[in-house]
Amino acid sequence: MTYSINHLSSRKPYSINSVFGQTNFTLPLYASTPPSIDRLQLTLLRTSLVLKFEILSGHKLASPQNARHVTTINGTISMHPRLITLGALAASVVSSAVAAQTAPDSSAPTPTESSAPPAAPASWASTITNSIHIEGGATFNPAGPDDGLNFGHLFTDKSNDGLLNQVAITSTRPLDPKATGVDIGYKLQGFYGSDARYTHFIGELDRDQDRRNQFDVVEANVLIHVPILTKLGIDIKAGQYSTPIGNEVIDPTGNFFYSHTYIFNFGIPLKHTGFYTTTHVSPVLDIYAGYDTGVNTSVGSKGGDNAGEFHFLGGFGLNMGKLTVLALTHIGPENPDGSLGPHVNVHSYNRYENDAVITYKFNDKLTSITELNYIRDDGVGATGGGVAQYFTYVLTPEVTAGVRGEVWRDNNGFYVAAFPGNLDYIDAATGRLNGSFGGYVTTYGAITLGVNFKPAKLPKMIDGLVFRPEVRYDRALAGANPFDSGHSVDQFTFGIDAILPINF
């Protein structure tokens, strides 16, 4: 038996802002009789993605004679990190029984009918969401390296020291997945914190802040849906945006772990300036194609960063119910002027960054994510790549456990490095003299165990607060000592952070 959920029946998007793993939610259910609820099934339109919600409890709020019954449904959602905010949803509650034994009054709506008048279409402005998140943490290294660095880490690179990773402000209006005509959205996101050392667009706020905590622009883009070519249409993103490539993201609310993989740190781009299209060929298949100015680059040539050259981003996405695949590539010249020699045209040599993310949901609690990565730079003849495997398991509505294993090969000692100075990373990217070090030809292995703890019954303004403790072990698997200031083959670290959302 199906009951309509009127809160989700309007065009206004229902947003669930989540840290990877789980999110508590409360929804109202209206029916002519109080239902006995087994499960709640929500379908994200256009992608035909089905998310199953475990129903933890139902409480009848009002049930006067011959009147509608209102039941509040509390549950938990487990989500892929790139599906942090859902748009308008079609929803239904599947019920095995109806508690009332007598027939409902004939004047009351039947369970299959909408029991409330249709909501007026939401205004465009009412679908805008604004939020803040604050992330801070620390990573403890019992070896106490002399240089104070956790080698192989970037965003958690400071050993035995606290970091204010991000104080971020986000304003967004996502595209309406139910739109049948032209629809327009946007996303603006910027932050202040230590993460900005590694996320700058070259030429934007990059060398003006010689300190640990810096300002950075992450997203400044326009979203457009146009109903052309296919029944489901095309989505366009134009401006400055985080890369769609890879499993982990800059925004910490989209990641399960505090620390990042070698793939995220050294094997994929982080941001682009340009545009790309997502063509929804069918509910199963999406095709990606776009042009941008390069890896972490802005408009124009800033420090010989190849921003004036053509760079291609493309690939495909598959959505087959429990199984999803996102396979993307980015191709274009990335080496700064002069880095290959005084008489070498760096614009003639491409870098190829290839990545595939395969997600499988065994059930509502257990999720597997496999990431495959390969990178090649023709200019220096360097290759690298590997695989990362994640498993997460929902233990309770408040606690989710996870494990991540990774093997990543730096064949030529070109990609993996440490950057002790606040400007070393951006100076290396633009060919300037810098204090970075690395050059180890080896295979890196890492395994991380962690937990996400989300306290329940928090005030709405800070609902979603999460603590992420983790223990991580890194090891060079082939004849190198990159850790503990170049003295050790391996490294133990213990990290913890907290992400505090402020919801408006």
Model segments located where?
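Short hydrophobic alpha-helical segments enriched in small aliphatic residues
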Residues: 31, 60, 67-70
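N-terminal periplasmic/intermembrane-space "pro-region" immediately following the signal or transit peptide
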Residues: 55, 66-68, 72-153, 430-434, ...
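Outer membrane beta-barrel
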Residues: 116-296, 306-310, 317-324, 390-413, ...
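Outer-membrane beta-barrel pore domains
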Residues: 155-156, 196-199, 207-210, 321-333, ...
